């Protein structure tokens, strides 16, 4: 068990980097693009936001059922670190694939929604392993401080990335 400053910082940087998923994709930018722009092509009695909510709800149920099993498996096999890397790598690939979601046909809404749902499930699998490592990078005396340090890095990463997205991409399209 390494609890030195470098190990804790490396652990917390995953939170910094993973903030891109929740801040940019799930909450503020891609989900809005998917429901407001891509979803405008849908011919449905339900709004795109409702349909997207249902898809993400299915993902949430899957997370609730499967994530504990994924975490338990990684704990028993001692593969937390490797599992974190694998789930993160696959999530990054899914995030990159969202680049190809266009707003010119209804099928793209469903492609984007399914990719987001799968990515959400796999991202949470990664988070299970990330949080399970907290006991490996902290002691009983500093677990709260280390956890808060990681949590704070996550928020900071999300804010920085949202500024980059807003000023680098979104604001340019609005003005």
Q: What is the role of each PLM region?
A:
Residues 123-139:
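Intracellular juxtamembrane helix-capping segments at the cytosolic ends
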Residues 37, 76-77, 133-137:
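Helix-to-coil boundary motifs at intracellular loop junctions of multi-pass secondary transporters
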Residues 144-169:
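Glycine-rich segments within core transmembrane alpha-helices of 12-TM secondary carriers
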Residues 64, 84-106:
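C-terminal ends and interior cores of transmembrane alpha-helices
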Residues 25-29, 49-74, 90-94, 159-163:
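Central cavity-lining transmembrane alpha-helices of secondary-active solute carriers
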Residues 1-60, 109:
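Helix-loop boundary and gating motifs at the non-cytosolic
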Residues 14, 54-55, 87, 115, ...:
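Hydrophobic alpha-helical segments of secondary membrane carriers
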Residues 46-50, 138-151:
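Loop-to-transmembrane helix entry/capping segments in MFS-fold secondary transporters
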């Amino acid at each position: 068990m390494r609890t030195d400053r470098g190990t804790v910082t490396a652990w917390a940087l995953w939170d910094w980097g993973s903030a891109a998923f929740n801040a940019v994709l799930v909450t503020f930018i891609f989900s809005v693009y998917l429901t407001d722009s891509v979803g405008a092509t849908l011919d449905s009695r339900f709004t795109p936001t409702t349909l997207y909510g249902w898809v993400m709800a299915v993902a949430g149920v899957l997370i609730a059922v499967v994530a504990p099993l994924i975490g338990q498996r990684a704990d028993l096999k001692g593969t937390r670190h490797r599992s974190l890397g694998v789930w993160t790598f696959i999530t990054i690939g899914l995030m990159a694939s969202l680049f190809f979601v266009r707003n010119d046909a209804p099928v793209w809404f469903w492609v984007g929604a399914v990719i987001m749902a799968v990515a959400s499930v796999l991202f949470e699998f990664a988070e299970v392993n990330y949080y399970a490592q907290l006991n490996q990078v902290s002691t009983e005396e500093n677990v709260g401080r280390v956890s808060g340090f990681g949590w704070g890095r996550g928020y900071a990463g999300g804010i920085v990335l949202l500024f980059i997205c807003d000023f680098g991409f979104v604001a340019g399209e609005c003005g």
